[in-house]
Amino acid sequence: MGVIEFLFALAQDMILAAIPAVGFAMVFNVPVRALRWCALLGAIGHGSRMILMTSGLNIEWSTFMASMLVGTIGIQWSRWYLAHPKVFTVAAVIPMFPGISAYTAMISAVKISQLGYSEPLMITLLTNFLTASSIVGALSIGLSIPGLWLYRKRPRV
């Protein structure tokens, strides 16, 4: 993949990630003045995850580092705009949730219950379930670490 193709793919990924970020921000009753920042932060998070995955990191670690970036930027923006960090960060990480792997794991579980046990279905179920669980864990831990680190009252050393 050339540089131009990568930049177009990155721009497309970021634009398409901003749409659900704004949608979920509207569901969560985020103030109108913060919607554009939720979209931008969702695009930054998903774009940084794509860059990390393209550079060779797996999806779990890429998601963890992207959610740490989203958490850090959200804390900084909350100081600038006098809002709670969750106003920006929660809607911004929603596009990174593992919908496909969770859906595939669920469909495999339904097929196992209907057709009976088979090893390929069980491998598909466990692989996708563990991937989805790892990504959700990476999102939650990565989003909470910047708050624990930046709001710490005691010295770090």
Curated annotation (Swiss-Prot):
Source organism superkingdom: Bacteria
GO biological process, one term: succinate transport
Keyword DNA damage: no
Membrane topology: Multi-pass membrane protein
InterPro entries in the cross-refs: ThrE_2, ThrE_Dicarb/AminoAcid_Exp, YjjB
Residues passing through the membrane, by range: 8-28, 50-70, 87-107, 129-149
NCBIfam families recorded: PRK09917.1 (NF007391)
Taxonomic placement: Bacteria, Pseudomonadati, Pseudomonadota, Gammaproteobacteria, Enterobacterales
One GO CC term on file: plasma membrane
Record text on subunit structure and interactions: The transporter is composed of YjjB and YjjP.
Localization: Cell inner membrane
Family, as annotated: Belongs to the ThrE exporter (TC 2.A.79) family.
Function summary: Involved in succinate export with YjjP. Both proteins are required for export.
Species, as recorded: Shigella sonnei (strain Ss046)
Name of the protein: Probable succinate transporter subunit YjjB
Alphabetical list of Pfam families matching this protein: ThrE_2
Keywords, ordered alphabetically: Cell inner membrane, Cell membrane, Membrane, Transmembrane, Transmembrane helix, Transport
